[in-house]
Swiss-Prot record:
GO molecular-function term, one example from the UniProt record: DNA-binding transcription factor activity, RNA polymerase II-specific
Low complexity: compositionally biased ranges: 90-100
Similarity field: Belongs to the bZIP family.
Name of the protein in question: Cyclic AMP-responsive element-binding protein
Signal peptide: none
Domain KID: 35-94
Amino acid sequence: MELARHSFQQPLNVAPSLSNVVNKTSVVLQQQSVIQPNQHQLQHQLQTMHDGGIDGKRREILARRPSYRRILDDLAGDGPVKMENYDDTGSSGESSPNGNNEEDINGINQSVSHQEKQYQSIHLNGIVSSVQGGENSLNQLHDSQPGDNQYIITTQGPDNKIQAYTIKGTLPIGLDNTSLASPHQLAEEATRKRELRLYKNREAARECRRKKKEYVKCLENRVAVLENQNKALIEELKSLKDLYCSKGD
C-alpha cells in the first residue's frame, strides 16, 4: 500500500514542475516579444527628432533671409541696387538688371559712401560722439544759437573739405558753454593764458633777484666782521710780541 501510494504521488509532483517550465518559457517569449517593439519605436523616435531638427534649422534660415534683404535695402536707399527675392522653398531669383552680383555690391558701396559724405543731424542727450569714419578729425564745437540746445561740429577731411554736423540735445556732464567758443575766443583765451604765464615767470625772476641781493649783502657783512676780527687779532699778537721782547731784554 505504501509503494502504491508513493507511485501515485510521483505524477502529482512532476506535474507542477512541468507547469513551471511552461510558465518560464512563456515569460521569456513574452519578454522578447515586448523588447523588440521598444527598440523599433526608439529608433523611429530618434529618426523623427533628427528630421525635425533639420527642418527647424531650414525654416530658421529661410526666416532670416527677408531680414537680410531688408537691411541691405535700407543701406542701398534709393539707388539702383536690387536684391534677390527668396520664396518659401529657399530658391532665389535675381532681380538686378544685368544679373551681375559684383555690380550690386559696387552700388551698395557707392551708396553707403555717399551717405557718409552727407551732412548728418544727430539727436542725443548724452556724450557727443562723431558718426563719421576715421578719416575726419574734430576741429570745432560751438553753439549755433544760445538757448536752443543745438550745437554744430565742424570737421575737415583729408581732401580739405569742411563738413558740419548738427547736434541737438543737452550738454553732457563736464561740458559747459564756456568750452563751446568760437576760434577768435579760443585765440584770445590762449593769448591770455600765455600772458599770465609770462607774468608769473617775471614775478618769480624778480623775487629770485631780490633774494640774491639780500644774500650778497649778508655775505658782505660777514666778510666785514671777519676782517675786523682779523685786525684785532693781529694787533693783539703785536702787543704780545712787544711784551715778550721787553721781558727778554
